[in-house]
């Protein structure tokens, strides 16, 4: 199984888009990318818009190599919608290019879902159903493809128990040599997702940490809970970990990584690149773009 990370916060955008290659089969997981419309009361910096364009090109490129697409939930950083979106770099044409003639394994659009995601799922499926090969509601199901298997978790909370953000599904892919879990927005904050991951005994876990960047959020509690849960997963499974997404929107994410029982990589580090947590440093990027002095822990010469 070959893993190709496509987009994430360590690569400059909101996403956890992933491509897996197993023989001649391509699996595209959560094919979406987006930017936070407001952070520090600021719109995205020029560097973020450029990173989004690069992420979009990657997702479009690898969608053409995929026969299977999985969608964990209906937030726009996890699927490409059928509308013109500046901060999603989306359009009907791009969506058609991604989903046409594909088999989709998706979070159930009507069960264990909040009102906002139900509306988004309806809008997405209204268009997707016209062009896809097949759609499977994947929650809690197992699929055998001969050379590999895919198993989806039941719907688990998007974050902590009782989260108003709804539910997501995780996916496990096993080709007989490696067992990988992609756990997008569990945020490492609920018991159901932790227990399902441990039960699956993955060799590699791709996941996002708690959203400790949110103002007014119970940051201390989320930090300690996320850390405790991930360390428990590491102890029980000895899995290699790729940790990215929400956590990387917090400038302090390196401290979280240092407190883990085992070294974790971001998507950028897996690709042997430097982390570019652009959203976390949006304030500084705006200053740099105005010609003012500001420090960021990554190279900015690539877009200036």
UniProtKB/Swiss-Prot annotation:
InterPro entries: RibonucZ/Hydroxyglut_hydro, UPF0173_UPF0282_UlaG_hydrolase, UPF0282_hydrls
Record's signal peptide: none
Family membership: Belongs to the UPF0282 family.
NCBIfam families, alphabetized: PRK04286.1-6
HAMAP family attached to this UniProt entry: UPF0282 (MF_01406)
Protein name per its UniProtKB record: UPF0282 protein TSIB_1029
């Amino acid at each position: 199984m070959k893993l190709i990370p496509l987009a994430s916060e360590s690569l400059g955008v909101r996403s956890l888009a992933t491509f897996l290659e197993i023989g001649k089969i391509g699996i595209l997981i959560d094919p979406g990318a987006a930017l936070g419309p407001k952070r520090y009361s600021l719109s995205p910096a020029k560097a973020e818009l450029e990173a989004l364009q690069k992420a979009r090109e990657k997702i479009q490129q690898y969608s053409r190599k995929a026969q299977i697409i999985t969608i964990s939930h209906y937030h726009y950083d996890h699927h490409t919608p059928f509308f013109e979106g500046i901060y999603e770099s989306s359009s009907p044409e791009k969506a058609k290019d991604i989903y046409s003639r594909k088999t989709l394994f998706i979070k159930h659009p009507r069960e264990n879902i909040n009102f906002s995601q139900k509306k988004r799922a309806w809008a997405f499926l209204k268009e997707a159903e016209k062009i896809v090969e097949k759609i499977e509601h994947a929650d809690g199901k197992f699929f055998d493809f001969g050379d590999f298997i895919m198993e989806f978790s039941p719907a688990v909370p998007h974050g902590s128990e009782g989260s108003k953000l709804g539910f997501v599904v995780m996916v496990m892919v096993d080709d007989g040599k490696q067992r990988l879990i992609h756990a997008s927005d569990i945020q490492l904050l609920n018991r159901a997702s932790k227990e399902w991951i441990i039960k699956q005994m993955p060799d590699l876990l791709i996941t996002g940490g708690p959203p400790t960047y949110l103002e007014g959020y119970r940051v201390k509690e989320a930090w300690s809970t996320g850390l405790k849960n991930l360390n428990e997963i590491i102890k029980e499974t000895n899995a290699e970990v790729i940790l990215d997404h929400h956590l990387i929107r917090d400038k302090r994410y390196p401290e979280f990584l240092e407190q883990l029982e085992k070294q974790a990589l971001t998507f950028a580090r897996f690709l042997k690149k430097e982390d570019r947590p652009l959203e976390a440093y949006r304030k500084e990027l705006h200053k740099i773009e105005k010609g003012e002095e500001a420090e960021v822990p990554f190279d900015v010469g690539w877009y200036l």
